[in-house]
Regions:
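Active-site-lining helix/loop region of Rossmann-like oxidoreductase modules
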Residues: 159-226
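General beta-strand structural signal in soluble alpha/beta enzymes
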Residues: 63, 137-143, 185-187
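Short beta->alpha connector loops
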Residues: 81-84, 144-145, 166-167
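Phosphate-coordination loops involved in phosphoryl transfer and adenosine-cofactor binding
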Residues: 6-9, 98, 157
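NAD(P)+-binding Rossmann beta1-loop-alpha1 motif at the extreme N-terminus of oxidoreductases
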Residues: 2-53
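Rossmann-fold NAD(P)-binding glycine/threonine-rich loop
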Residues: 105-152
């Protein structure tokens, strides 16, 4: 993992947000070169500096625009709200050709965020696939992980379900899940992302009903040991 991380650059679009910042921190800590992308390069530079301070300058984290980040990266991760999903992807799609796109977006529709919303494409990930085209492998992951856990050193009590356009692409993202200190599961084709995205609204509802803040999911009855 360490050798591979030194060879790859990850762009986190919308990386100034809580989810993006947390993932960027985890990957930078694991040794990846990380680019923080944002519509505002100034905000991206500030967030990158904050992450570098947390890591005591031991990793490479750089802030720039979404387009610049996408163009320089090997793997591009989208961590924007659903309201900015299409606009963000449209703005960088030419820079994504031949690359791996990881979509963390959940199609939440405020104020009814505890109710599952199904986009016309079936899911946010399938919508992303329609926007970026067949030259881009699209994988959906990290939708159910609370951002709060990502900036903490303690173990994250939530598994990651990974769906995507090919098994090879899903395998690559499972490596990123592991690098972030999480447990990932190959959950199959990208069409299955509709279920994974919907679970986020279910978890939000559970948080409200039971007074919790960071409900997550765990896969039981299966083993990853070889």
């Amino acid at each position: 993992m360490a050798n591979e991380s030194l060879l790859l650059t990850i762009a986190v679009l919308g990386g100034t947000g809580k989810e993006g910042k947390g993932l960027a921190y985890r990957w930078a800590k694991a040794g990846y070169r990380v680019l923080i992308g944002s519509r505002s390069s100034e905000k991206a530079v500030t967030t990158a500096s904050e992450i570098m301070q947390l890591l005591e300058g031991s990793s490479s984290v750089v802030g720039t625009t979404n387009l610049e980040a996408a163009g320089q990266a090997d793997i591009v991760v989208v961590t924007v709200p659903y309201s900015a999903h299409r606009e963000t992807l449209e703005s960088v799609k030419d820079a994504l050709k031949g690359k791996l796109l990881v979509d963390t977006t959940v199609p939440l529709m405020p104020p009814k965020v505890s109710k599952v919303h199904v986009p016309a494409a079936g899911s946010a990930a399938q919508e992303a696939r329609e926007i970026v085209g067949d030259d881009v492998e699209v994988v959906a992951a990290f939708q159910n992980v609370s951002h709060k856990h990502l900036l903490e050193e303690e173990e994250v009590d939530c598994d990651v379900l990974v769906t995507g356009t090919s098994k090879t692409a899903r395998s690559e993202v499972l490596k990123l899940v592991e690098a972030a200190g999480l447990t990932g599961w190959d959950a199959g084709a990208i069409e299955n992302s509709i279920v994974v995205e919907g679970l986020t609204s279910v978890l939000i509802n559970i948080n409200k009903q039971y007074g919790s803040k960071h409900a997550g999911i765990k896969i039981t009855g299966a083993s990853q040991s070889s």
